[in-house]
């Protein structure tokens, strides 16, 4: 972990740069798989499942019998945890329901918005180094609340052709419509283009490795919408002399264990706190089953000493972290100054893990500095806003002449005439 003391503001842009992966070599592979799936459907998907996931599949769909078997394999303790998390995620996302009001912008002209769910959405849940069943809840729960008619989930099977039972249990709790045993680029292609088994969807959500991310970006150019661009996961912690170094170290390590390309970023007004956190990280790291992966992630990480709270929050806003933990005495004051972050955790007890699993907020968030322009997944991610307007004859009198003048000055005579004939009719 690299310690940087009092960096000049001219150095900040370089300081907040994330490690960049060269994905140019991925594109040919990704495009080849996507085109094969587009042209050959299920047969291509089954072939790639055997090649990449080493699973020989007779059917891509998860059967009712497999769902029942999965439920019997999940412990009662985990079921209760999933149900609690689902309840909290539901409560928070229910509160985001849109209630559009009709607005009379001028006499005789009424405008309003209507929120309409995206009919078909696709969710990608990685297998990888850990089964992300929590992501099923995060993506499927708001889709169900929004009113999406079809919620399709793809996740890679193991070598025996089985899906992790906790993923299936979470899918059942959250109300997923159809589940398919498909991973990687072929899953993105199947949902983007449709196959004999997999319905074509209108928007794809979910995390994945660099191949999955490249595939999502490729299909988003012409075929389907995606939730957001994404990169490796990250956390930024702002700490002062009152912070608990045990908590801070645990938060940094909880992020570092995601993968070797994850990044942790500590900003502190206290040099002593930085040293305590370093010591505690080394101590806790030895207790982790994924310590080799976490240790490699820490190589990408930075501990930054700043002169005061204002500089701390300014640097954080420049970094635009996916997760921001403010563990200072004045966390509420600093929270008001946050303008760039995916999700913010306030105080000593609000660990990132709470939001990752069960507080109720969504953990599908912009990474890699995308929080400068993107927000995380929320209820609106599954909706479209359609605008309506209604004009009476009084409305024509109110805006008709202005519309004609503006259209004429843009040299769009047909536009002008569409309003002019109505102005003439009302004026009779």
Regions found by a protein language model. Name each.
Residues 1-119:
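N-terminal Rossmann-like NAD(P)+-binding subdomain of aldehyde/semialdehyde dehydrogenases
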Residues 1-7, 178-183, 303-308:
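Short acidic-hydrophobic, aromatic-tinged amphipathic segments that line or gate anion-handling sites
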Residues 98-103, 225, 262-267, 287-297, ...:
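Flexible, glycine/charged-enriched surface loops at secondary-structure junctions
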Residues 103-169:
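Conserved small-residue-rich beta-alpha loop and adjacent elements
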Residues 175-263:
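Conserved NAD(P)+-binding/catalytic subdomain of aldehyde/semialdehyde dehydrogenases
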Residues 258, 266-337, 341:
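A glycine- and small/hydrophobic-rich beta-loop-beta segment
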Residues 318-428:
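C-terminal core of ALDH-fold dehydrogenases
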């Amino acid at each position: 972990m690299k310690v940087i003391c009092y960096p000049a503001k001219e150095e900040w842009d370089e300081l907040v740069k994330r490690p960049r992966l060269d994905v140019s070599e991925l594109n040919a592979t990704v495009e080849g798989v996507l085109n094969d799936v587009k042209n050959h459907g299920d047969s291509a998907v089954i072939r790639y499942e055997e090649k990449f996931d080493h699973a020989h599949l007779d059917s891509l769909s998860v059967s009712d019998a497999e769902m029942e078997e999965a439920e019997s394999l999940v412990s009662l303790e985990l079921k209760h945890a999933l149900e609690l998390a689902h309840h909290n995620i539901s409560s928070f996302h229910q509160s985001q329901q849109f209630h559009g009001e009709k607005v009379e912008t001028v006499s005789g002209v009424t405008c309003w918005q209507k929120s309409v769910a995206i009919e078909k959405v696709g969710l990608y849940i990685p297998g990888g180094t850990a089964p992300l069943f929590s992501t099923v809840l995060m993506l499927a729960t708001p889709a169900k609340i929004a009113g999406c008619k079809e919620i399709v989930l793809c996740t890679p099977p193991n070598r025996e052709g089985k899906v992790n039972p906790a993923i299936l249990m979470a899918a059942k709790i959250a109300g997923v419509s159809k589940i398919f045993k498909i991973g990687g680029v072929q899953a993105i292609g199947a949902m983007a283009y449709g196959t004999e088994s997999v319905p074509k969807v209108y928007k794809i959500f979910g995390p994945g490795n660099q191949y999955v991310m490249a595939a999502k970006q490729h299909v988003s150019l012409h075929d389907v919408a995606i939730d957001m661009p994404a990169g490796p996961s990250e956390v930024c912690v702002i700490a002062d002399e009152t912070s608990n170094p045990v908590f801070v170290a645990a938060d940094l390590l909880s992020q570092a264990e995601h993968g070797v390309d994850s990044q942790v970023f500590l900003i502190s007004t206290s040099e002593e706190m930085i040293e305590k956190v370093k010591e505690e990280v080394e101590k806790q790291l030895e207790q982790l089953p994924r310590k080799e992966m976490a240790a490699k992630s820490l190589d990408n990480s930075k501990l930054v000493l700043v002169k005061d709270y204002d500089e701390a929050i300014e640097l954080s806003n420049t970094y635009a972290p996916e997760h921001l933990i403010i563990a200072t005495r004045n966390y509420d004051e600093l929270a008001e100054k946050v303008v760039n972050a995916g999700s913010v955790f306030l105080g000593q007890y609000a660990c990132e893990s709470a939001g990752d699993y069960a507080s109720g907020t969504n953990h599908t968030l912009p990474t890699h500095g995308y929080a400068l322009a993107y927000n995380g997944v929320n209820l609106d991610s599954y909706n479209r806003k359609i605008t309506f307007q209604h004009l009476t004859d009084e409305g024509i009198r109110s805006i008709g002449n202005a519309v004609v003048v503006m259209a004429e000055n843009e040299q769009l005579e047909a536009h002008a005439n569409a309003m002019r004939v109505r102005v003439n009719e009302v004026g009779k």
